[in-house]
UniProtKB/Swiss-Prot annotation:
Residues 179-199 have a biased composition (Low complexity). This is Uncharacterized protein B0464.6. Residues 179-200, 349-377 are annotated as: Disordered. It comes from the Eukaryota. InterPro entries: Cytochrome_B561-rel. Coiled coil: none annotated. PANTHER family: TRANSMEMBRANE PROTEIN 209. One of its GO terms (cellular component) is membrane. It comes from Caenorhabditis elegans.
Length: 643
């Protein structure tokens, strides 16, 4: 069955067409709204299965009590309680005691059969009756004056254009935790008291990670206290995209609608936590129609910084459009003066040496160590170094162990678990992760109720990183075979498993070729898919990448350019400069808007050292948080890679 036929089949069933997008941006299946048709049907099916199991259990109890009733009735009426006498110490008690006991068992069986039948016919009727009795209270006297219900001013913000109070704009900061600075210290999870990383690694060498293997696995299991928060600000268009799955079925208040994540796979435990404040808040977009008589105009420049310009008006009062700022216009005038022959213009010709000296002085203003303080850490930040060479070597091995224990090994285990479920389905044509295409698996996850409640919908973002499913699954299992991914090859990969045409039972392997991803690119894409699952969607990511909150904000690939948000001061991201040969960098923007690239060794250690630099910067310069998700033990648990 081809991909086109699968798409037509899905389209004919009025399903969400975005689930068949096989590009790397298609990770929506792991972030479905709990009110979407897919998740609603999943919950309905779960409730039906629970109800069916409850009825089956009650019917089994009724059958056993009927058998008990029949046996003791025959013993009491026909055998004169001889069977009861044999059970009770072989006739030790008198006959009237045996007769009373058999009669008691008969009455007990009748009562239990009646109660079970009533429970099947009217489930939870007695509990509801008792609950209503407890909750019933005498009516309160009506007050003489009715007071209108005023919503809490702390939860409702007036973001309209007519509002004069704009303090909420200054109070809100995108990408920072929504709590006080006194709470920035990372606290361990209330469910698990884990020792600090320094205590665990004090007596452990680089080659021995037995003390951290169990702790690093907590990244999939420990619920993040501030992770996957459901509170953010979105534009109206983005909110429509997020809630498009249930707009036609349930009336939704667009200003206070809920959107809860259901990322509960791999034992994250997030489904049990209910956020008290999980509302979306719609923000007003900036327009230039507010005051036409204003002499100033606010504009976001190419470097991402906000610029305020004075408007120039002509003789008739119309505004003269000038997209260039004063500095760009000055550079154009100077360049024109350089190209103009001497003696034909009144503009002085500026020498190249003066121009270059000015450029060098501007560069020294943000990167020269002479302006920094005497501390070694600040000097390293301004020269583009976050970790020393010894720290990078240790962090490289720790990052290898963290990725293997936290992402690759659980991923391989749950792929085998889903394959066992698919084998029991006996589908025609047969489905299997690693053999079937991603489109076929997505269609099966939508059509079959048994797969909706499985781990398959949450595996789809990881399976979408490359179309060759056989090589992808085989390479994941090969990489997670050892603690430090000894099979990792930065500029190549493993052999490709293929079926031999002559002998169908024989599995042969072809050497790695350019059509397959390198291990560096493969591990990087899987790392991005995992991080996308940990963060919430954000209003800065745009309308088409709401399902990639981490990739769209903290990653730049070779064919892309940094977005305006990534070029703003104090932002940071991972940059995959080239794919062949693969080379990654960590880049952070200083207070002047200049990009500082950290020195990362090339070849095999490159990817892991770049990720370690990223984690180090988040921990020390961003309070240990990515957006509202902690990277410490209470969240994603990434800080273990730092010694």
């Amino acid at each position: 069955m081809t991909a086109d036929s699968l798409r037509e089949r899905l389209k004919s069933q009025n399903a969400d067409y975005s689930l068949l997008n096989t590009s790397q941006a298609s990770n929506r299946s792991a972030f479905e709204d709990k009110m979407s048709p897919v998740c609603k049907s999943r919950y309905v099916n779960d409730n039906q299965r629970l109800e069916q199991s409850r009825i089956t259990m009650l019917e089994t109890r009724i059958k056993w009590h009927i058998i008990l009733l029949t046996g003791f009735s025959i013993d009491h009426l026909v055998l004169n309680s001889s069977f009861t006498s044999a059970i009770l110490l072989f006739g030790f008690f008198p006959s009237y005691v045996n007769s009373s006991i058999s009669l008691f068992v008969i009455i007990y069986s009748l009562i239990m059969i009646a109660s079970y039948a009533f429970e099947i016919k009217f489930p939870n009727a007695l509990k509801q009756l008792v609950y209503n009795k407890v909750q019933s209270k005498p009516p309160r006297p009506e007050s003489s004056k009715s007071t209108p219900i005023v919503p809490d001013a702390q939860n409702v913000l007036d973001t309209s254009v007519q509002s004069n109070d704009l303090s909420w704009v200054d109070a809100h900061r995108f990408g920072t935790p929504s709590f006080k600075s006194s709470q920035l210290q990372q606290s361990p999870s209330p469910n698990k008291k884990s020792p600090s990383y320094s205590q665990v690694m004090s007596n452990v060498s680089v080659s021995d990670t037995s003390g951290i293997l169990e702790d690093t696995k907590g990244g999939w299991k420990s619920p993040a206290v501030y992770g996957k928060s459901n509170e953010s600000i979105h534009t109206r268009k983005q909110l429509d995209v997020l809630l498009r799955s249930n707009q036609d079925e349930i009336p939704v208040d667009m200003n206070t609608s809920t959107f809860s994540s259901i990322w509960s796979v791999f034992g994250l435990g997030r489904s049990g936590q209910i956020s008290a404040n999980n509302t979306w808040q719609v923000s007003e977009e900036i327009t230039n129609d507010g005051n036409t008589n204003s002499s100033y105009r606010m504009k976001i420049g190419k470097n991402g910084r906000t610029e305020v310009k004075m408007l120039r008006r002509g003789k008739d009062g119309e505004i003269e459009e000038e997209d260039e700022d004063e500095l760009v216009r000055l550079h154009k005038i100077l360049n024109a003066a350089k190209l103009t022959p001497e003696g034909k213009t009144g503009i002085l010709k500026r020498s190249n040496s003066i121009d270059r000296a000015g450029i060098r002085s501007r560069r020294r203003s943000h990167s020269s160590p002479e302006r920094s303080t005497s501390t070694e850490n600040e000097i390293r930040y301004q020269t583009g170094e976050l970790l020393t060479e010894d720290q990078q070597k240790r962090a490289e091995f720790m990052t290898r162990a963290w990725i293997r224990n936290t992402i690759l090994e659980p991923l391989a285990e749950h792929i085998d678990k889903v394959n066992k479920i698919l084998d029991k389905e006996h589908a025609n044509p047969p489905l299997r992760v690693g053999v079937s295409s991603v489109d076929a698996l997505k269609l099966a996850a939508i059509e079959r109720d048994s797969l909706k409640s499985s781990d398959l919908p949450f595996l789809l973002p990881f399976l979408s990183v490359h179309p060759n499913q056989k090589y992808l699954i085989s390479r994941i299992k090969e990489l997670c075979a050892t603690q430090f991914m000894d099979a990792y090859k930065w500029n190549s990969g493993g052999s490709e498993p293929t079926d031999d045409n002559d002998q169908m039972t024989r599995l042969v392997r072809r050497e790695w070729n350019d059509s397959l991803p390198t291990d560096a690119v493969l591990v990087f894409d899987i790392f991005l898919a995992y991080m996308d699952a940990q963060l919430n969607s954000n209003c800065l990511v745009g309308d088409s990448r709401l399902d990639q909150p981490f990739t769209s904000r903290f990653c730049v690939k070779n064919a892309q350019k940094p977005s305006s948000a990534q070029r703003t001061p104090f932002s940071f991201y991972l940059h995959m400069v080239t794919k062949s040969p693969p080379h990654a960098e960590f880049v952070h923007i200083d207070e002047n808007g200049y990009a500082i690239k950290c020195n990362v060794l090339r070849q095999s250690p490159n990817l892991f050292r770049a990720i370690a630099q990223f984690i180090h910067f988040v921990k020390h310069e961003n309070h240990g948080y990515l957006d509202q998700t902690s990277i410490g033990p209470s969240g994603i648990n990434m800080t273990y890679v730092l010694a």
